[in-house]
A protein has these predicted regions:
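TOPRIM metal-binding catalytic domain and adjacent DNA-binding surface shared by DnaG-type primases
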Residues: 1-19, 23-102, 110, 118-135
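Phosphate-handling DNA/RNA-contact segment within nucleic-acid enzymes
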Residues: 84-184, 200
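Metal-dependent DNA phosphodiester-chemistry modules and their immediately adjacent helices/loops
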Residues: 216-235
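Modules that initiate DNA replication and primer synthesis
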Residues: 2-38, 169-216, 226
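A generic structural motif
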Residues: 162-164, 212-221
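General alpha-helical segment detector with a strong preference for membrane-spanning helices
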Residues: 145, 149, 195, 225-228
Length: 235
């Protein structure tokens, strides 16, 4: 199977981030379903490919434009740093089931995403912070959205996000299914676009009937809800 290495804009439908690039060169847009065949050779894109090696150093700070406090970023290990090329990025640090750091997911100002380390070993983002059981857990599409929901609830709720966004929702939820099934309710708060809605439809049947709840919002995602409408709109 090919491995997704990044998401980005789709030239066919204009979606800003639904077009997934895979390591054999093919692309698939989860919004308009456009498939572009690759060459079969490994795809190399500067600042977008999966890279291994020493992890990046970052500084934890408040993300004011996102409405996120330093304390929230510290809790999730979300920092600001730079790629070895010097490109400024935000860095989400991922851990494996044992709690060890195994990968980092980076994002630059142009929404280019890349992995450092071994993303295949990574659990859901924030899974290491969770109790593993309880009344409710919220699953968001992106890391910033997970931080947003967590902060809105005083960083007391269990909140996680998908490592690969909407396109990797089924694989990620299946991998962590036993963990997620430990909760009475699993709330899916994916982006309010076609890719997000499709992702919800693909994963909801994984769970025990009645366990999944779908969060509905008039905004694009949880962070936009927090920034534009405030904490009460999230909670």
């Amino acid at each position: 199977d090919s491995l997704q290495v990044s998401t980005g804009p789709c030239p066919a439908c204009g979606s800003s981030d639904a077009n997934a690039l895979y390591d054999d060169g093919h692309t698939y847009c989860h919004s308009c379903k456009t498939h572009v065949q690759g060459t079969g050779e490994p795809t190399i894109r500067k600042s977008r490919t999966v890279r291994s090696g020493v992890f990046l150093n970052g500084e934890v700070r408040a993300l004011n434009k996102r409405g996120l406090t330093e304390a929230t970023c510290q809790r999730f290990g979300y920092s600001v740093g730079a790629l070895r090329s010097g490109v400024p990025v935000q860095i989400a640090t991922y851990r494996d089931a044992g709690g060890s750091i195994v990968a980092q997911h980076t994002r630059d100002a142009d929404k280019n995403f890349a992995w450092v380390g071994d993303s295949k070993q990574a659990t859901l983002y924030g899974e290491n912070l969770c109790r593993g059981s309880g009344r409710r857990i919220v699953v968001t599409e992106g890391e910033i959205d997970a931080l947003s929901v967590s902060q809105a609830f005083g960083n007391t709720w269990d909140v996680v996000s998908l490592p690969g966004g909407a396109s990797g929702a089924l694989k990620a939820c299946r991998k962590s299914l036993s963990f997620l099934e430990g909760y009475d309710e699993v709330v899916l708060w994916f982006d309010a676009d076609e890719a997000g809605r499709t992702a919800v439809e693909t994963v909801v049947d994984l769970f025990t009937p009645g366990r999944c709840k779908i969060a509905l919002s008039t905004r694009k995602d949880a962070n936009e809800t927090l920034v534009l409408d405030g904490v009460k709109a999230v909670t």
